[in-house]
Amino acid sequence: MATHEHYYVPAQSKWPIIATVGMFVTVYGLATWFNDLKAARPESHGPLIFFIGGLLVAYMLFGWFGAVIKESRAGLYSPQLDRSFRWGMSWFIFSEVMFFVAFFGALFYVRHVSVPGLAGEGTKGLSHMLWPNFEYAWPLLNNPDPKLYPAPKEVISPWGLPLLNTVLLVSSSVTITIAHHALKKGHRGALKLWLAITVLLGCAFLGFQAEEYIHAYKELGLTLGSGVYGATFFMLTGFHGAHVTIGTIILFVMLMRILRGHFDNEHQFGFEAASWYWHFVDVVWIGLFIFVYVL
């Protein structure tokens, strides 16, 4: 006789609409902020709108995930729902992969198609008419129109902070894996220790990246206004930094849950999802280190 799994269907929730409004307000505030900066408006409501949107998103995350945690610990979830969570997280990471595929694609297009074309490769017509003295080299320290887009004085060496950050993130992948094995074996002390070390490594990475950005802006002249090189550099490293920030927050929440006695060797998907996300962030950074800093 066939057995049927129960499938928990929650009541109607306010969290999806709060998530939608929060994300809209956040993006609108950020766009307003950037536009006002470009227009040199002394007073801008963009930062305030962005902050309000961020608060709404934070409220939604704590409330929605808190409800999911309570339902899970109450035994309302079935193996079928666990599979749904795993598929959902897998597709979410896949969508994030596509983001970075697009950004890396933009970098490769700029390096191998558009900028070489401006320097005279291919038809040469456009470059001879507008920028006859422009020569292609990457990293781009000589923009076609230096008056409009001043090029950076120099680029960031990969063998300083970027290499250190690579060591930190690769080490954090090792520590989160050790923590995961400790969870499976029921070694709570080792689990707490190695997960805390992972969180600290993530915080250290973010601190060094902030130092790198300050150095780039103040001393190297490498900014968002430094032409296409600055734009692609900050787009890729900044978007990745946002993911490291999110991942570090997630790992910290996992640590707080573990300190409260959550998770065991059978019920641990929240921790597994966090570790999947962290490994994804680490792999992306290796690609960034190679293609943005080294090559």
Residue ranges and their predicted role:
Residues 1-295:
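...captures the hydrophobic TM-helix bundle architecture rather than a specific catalytic motif
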